[in-house]
């Protein structure tokens, strides 16, 4: 069999386009390869946020949303909008998974624990959903409602949690029941890279009220954390308990509702509540009445989900498999789930003909300490796969722009972009050497805005700006403007001379000659 000439899609995570060069790590980095590609190859900008990816208008994109839209070849109605709509329609308050779980605890006189990322950021959760769950528990008769706050500072400004905490203090006062019971940064509660020592801190706080600090109010806990120079993301385990209040530790018969809807950073803390969990020794294992996931975090987590995934038929991965094509998915640990699970529309298992390759992300506290991450090793494997002649289609994600962008350290983000540029040069050379085709894009922006232009503070969140799309291959092809992420799969099928399934409603972004 002759060697295949692959079509590779390289996703530069967090590599957005912004006209303003100020505090723009991408524009100000020394990137001769990317500059040359923009000057000499077909390229355009495409949308990766808001309505174009199934989010509310103006809402910044994120990796889960981006990869789901890319892989689906159609705009996918995201969990954020789906859940928000259900609250507005009233369906949320009759959701069977939620009502059953709450009523089990309420009828036994036990507590309803509501936990999640306390944030208006809309990436992993939304505090409006958390407020609705609290109101629902109160209306159903819960007397003990405990809110466990994971603080953001990553998809929101680094010190922005106070407004949210005050909002919920006011809500509990209005309801006349319930309280905020704990605070902890998402660094501990929402790890996704098997840093079980961090997860253990959060688990002990939630299950046993074991904390580094105990204070009498949420705002006091936050103020103390700031005085220790801890931004929201890194706030240490803090119990909120005023004198005379009983502990909010979880006990037998309690119910837990986990209000994050994005799966990747919800899995580890959820697994810590499973009966057969062994990644660290648990000091307390309450026999909960129910633990409800807002969405399904993984197929092998056997817990109820309030909003199970909608099934996406004939995603790019499934369609390539049906057509007998060989495909490779490759990334570092940090974005491995995105090029596999999310790209496949929430399908955990590989399709026939799909190979997965994982490169371990470096074990550092924060990625500004190693901005190149594992890009050199990833590139070595990617180049070998391109030249190996085995695969028809290759999907690769480089996490650097996003993961280093999230640290808010500008110089490190510049170094990350420069490291990537060298890697892209090797990939382009490999593609050309085998007569293949290459598309370079991003799932959302991040590193192009390292300072918030409104506040002047460090900007660690994603952006709602467009992302590049570059094509290396047939010089006769030109790219259309006005595209979006969901146009990539039909475009790739067209480039591969494969028919496009009816479910893919995205447009082909080439003016085919």
Curated annotation (Swiss-Prot):
Protein residues bound to substrate: 124, 154-155, 186, 192, 262-265, 335
Gene3D superfamilies attached to this UniProt entry: Alkaline Phosphatase, subunit A, BPG-independent phosphoglycerate mutase, domain B
Family recorded in the similarity comment: Belongs to the BPG-independent phosphoglycerate mutase family.
Keyword terms of this UniProt record: Glycolysis, Isomerase, Manganese, Metal-binding
PANTHER family: 2,3-BISPHOSPHOGLYCERATE-INDEPENDENT PHOSPHOGLYCERATE MUTASE
Cofactor: how and how many bound: Binds 2 manganese ions per subunit.
GO cellular component: cytosol
Binding positions (Mn(2+) 2): 13, 63, 443-444
Lineage of the species this protein comes from: Bacteria, Pseudomonadati, Pseudomonadota, Gammaproteobacteria, Vibrionales
EC nos: 5.4.2.12
Quaternary structure and interacting proteins, as annotated: Monomer.
InterPro entries: Alkaline_phosphatase_core_sf (IPR017850), BPG-indep_PGM_N (IPR011258), Metalloenzyme (IPR006124), PGAM_B_sf (IPR036646), Pgm_bpd_ind (IPR005995)
Organism: Photobacterium profundum (strain SS9)
Catalytic activity reported: (2R)-2-phosphoglycerate = (2R)-3-phosphoglycerate
Binding site for Mn(2+) 1: 402, 406, 462
Gene Ontology molecular function terms on file: manganese ion binding; phosphoglycerate mutase activity
Active-site positions on this chain: 63 (phosphoserine intermediate)
Coiled-coil spans in chain: none
Task of the protein: Catalyzes the interconversion of 2-phosphoglycerate and 3-phosphoglycerate.
The protein's name: 2,3-bisphosphoglycerate-independent phosphoglycerate mutase
Pathway field: Carbohydrate degradation; glycolysis; pyruvate from D-glyceraldehyde 3-phosphate: step 3/5
Biological process annotations from GO: glucose catabolic process; glycolytic process
Cofactors named for this entry: Mn(2+)
């Amino acid at each position: 069999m002759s060697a295949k000439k692959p079509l590779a899609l390289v996703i530069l995570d967090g590599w957005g386009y912004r006209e303003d060069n100020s505090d723009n790590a991408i524009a100000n980095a020394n990137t001769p390869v990317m500059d040359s590609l923009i000057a000499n190859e077909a390229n355009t900008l495409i949308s990766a946020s808001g309505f174009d990816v199934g989010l509310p208008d103006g809402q910044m994109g994120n990796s889960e949303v981006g990869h789901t839209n890319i892989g689906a070849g159609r705009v996918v109605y995201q969990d954020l909008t789906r859940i928000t709509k259900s609250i507005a329609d009233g369906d949320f308050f009759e959701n069977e998974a939620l009502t059953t779980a709450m009523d089990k605890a309420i009828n036994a006189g036990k507590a309803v624990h509501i936990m999640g990322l306390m944030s208006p950021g809309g990436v992993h959760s939304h505090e409006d959903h958390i407020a609705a769950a609290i109101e629902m528990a109160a209306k159903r008769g819960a007397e003990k409602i405990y809110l466990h706050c994971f603080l953001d500072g990553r998809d929101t400004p680094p010190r922005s949690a106070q407004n949210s905490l005050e909002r919920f203090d006011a809500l509990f006062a209005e309801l006349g029941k319930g309280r905020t019971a704990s605070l902890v940064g998402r660094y501990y509660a929402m790890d996704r890279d098997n840093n079980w020592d961090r997860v253990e801190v959060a688990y002990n706080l939630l299950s046993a009220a074991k904390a580094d600090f105990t204070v009498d109010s949420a705002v006091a806990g936050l103020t103390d954390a700031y005085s220790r120079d801890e931004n929201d993301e890194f706030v240490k385990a803090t119990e909120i308990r005023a004198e005379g209040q009983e502990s909010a530790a979880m006990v037998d018969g309690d119910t837990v509702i986990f209000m994050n809807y994005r799966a990747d950073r919800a899995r580890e803390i959820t697994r810590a509540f499973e009966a057969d969990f062994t990644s660290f020794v648990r000091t307390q294992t309450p026999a909960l009445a129910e633990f409800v996931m807002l969405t399904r975090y993984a197929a092998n987590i056997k817990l109820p989900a309030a909003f199970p995934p909608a099934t996406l038929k004939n995603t790019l991965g499934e369609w390539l498999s049906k057509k007998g094509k060989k495909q490779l998915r490759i990334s570092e640990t940090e974005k491995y789930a995105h090029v596999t699970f999310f790209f496949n529309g929430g399908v955990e298992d590989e399709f026939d003909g799909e190979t997965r390759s994982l490169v371990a992300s470096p074990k550092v506290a924060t990625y500004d300490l190693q901005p190149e991450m594992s890009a050199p090793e990833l590139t070595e494997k990617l180049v070998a796969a391109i030249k190996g002649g085995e695969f028809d289609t290759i999907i690769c994600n480089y996490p650097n722009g996003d993961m280093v962008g999230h640290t808010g350290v500008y110089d490190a983000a510049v170094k990350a972009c420069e490291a990537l540029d060298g890697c892209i040069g090797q990939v382009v050379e490999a593609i050309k050497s085998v007569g293949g085709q290459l598309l370079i894009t991003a799932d959302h922006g991040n590193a192009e805005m390292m300072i918030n232009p409104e506040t002047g503070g460090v900007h660690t969140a994603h952006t709602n700006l467009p992302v590049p799309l570059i094509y290396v291959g047939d010089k006769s092809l030109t790219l259309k403007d006005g595209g979006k992420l969901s146009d990539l799969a039909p475009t790739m099928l067209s480039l591969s001379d494969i028919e496009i399934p009816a479910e893919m409603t995205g447009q082909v972004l080439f003016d085919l000659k």
